[in-house]
Regions:
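Short, structured secondary-structure elements
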Residues: 1-159
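Long, non-membrane, amphipathic alpha-helices that form coiled-coils
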Residues: 154-197
């Protein structure tokens, strides 16, 4: 069900597994795609669907799922061409977020308001840049990478990896606690050695 229902949303949100410029390198967005499919399968309320995609990472005690949802904001094309001016493309990425968000969530094409007030809809250039300011808080570099996703990157382990990570974290904590205090075995060995001298 979710796969058939979500394809229109994935198109509106400009989902792709590649960066979209001349090299069209691979990027890993399938976890966000799967989040959308699962949201449709669970019949997630639209307000939650919207909030989690636009600002899931800003929710108090955001879950991994809510952070994945914000992949919506990272679906824009990414240019990794040599010689680009990163700040120029960072600006383009933010403008793309504004345009895509307005189209997908509000049903408005407001790209023209980037340069002037909208000719037909009550949307001003000032309002475009107010939305721009909201979306200009993603700490990205503006220049893509040769392989993989542009930073910042959310680490999303599989369930098996999460279990293994938790096991290793507990083991590290135990070993660090052992190292933080004196080692009684060494004290006994040192005392024995001193008596032999």
């Amino acid at each position: 069900f979710g796969e058939r229902m979500s394809f229109v949303w994935l198109d509106a949100a400009r989902y792709a597994d590649t960066n979209g410029y001349q090299r069209d390198t691979v990027r890993i967005m399938w976890r966000w795609r799967d989040w959308v499919i699962e949201a449709f399968n669970q019949n997630m309320p639209y307000d939650e669907f919207t909030i989690e995609q636009l600002a899931g990472d800003l929710l108090p005690d955001a879950t991994l799922s809510q952070r994945i949802a914000t992949g919506f904001n990272r679906n824009h094309r990414i240019n990794g061409e040599g010689g680009i001016i990163p700040e120029e493309y960072a600006v383009e990425y933010v403008a793309d977020r504004v345009s895509t968000t307005s189209t997908a969530f509000m049903g408005l094409s407001i790209s023209c308001a980037r340069c002037h007030d909208h000719k037909y809809d009550p949307f001003t250039q000032k309002e475009f840049y107010e939305l721009y300011a909201y979306f200009n808080n993603v700490p990205e570099e503006g220049k893509g990478r040769e392989v993989g996703n542009d930073v910042p990157i959310a680490e999303v382990p599989t369930p098996e990896q999460a279990v293994r990570r938790d096991e290793l974290t507990a083991k590290i904590a135990s070993l660090e606690q052992q190292l933080s205090g004196p080692d009684e075995r060494l004290d006994a060995l040192q005392t024995a050695w001193e008596q032999e001298q």
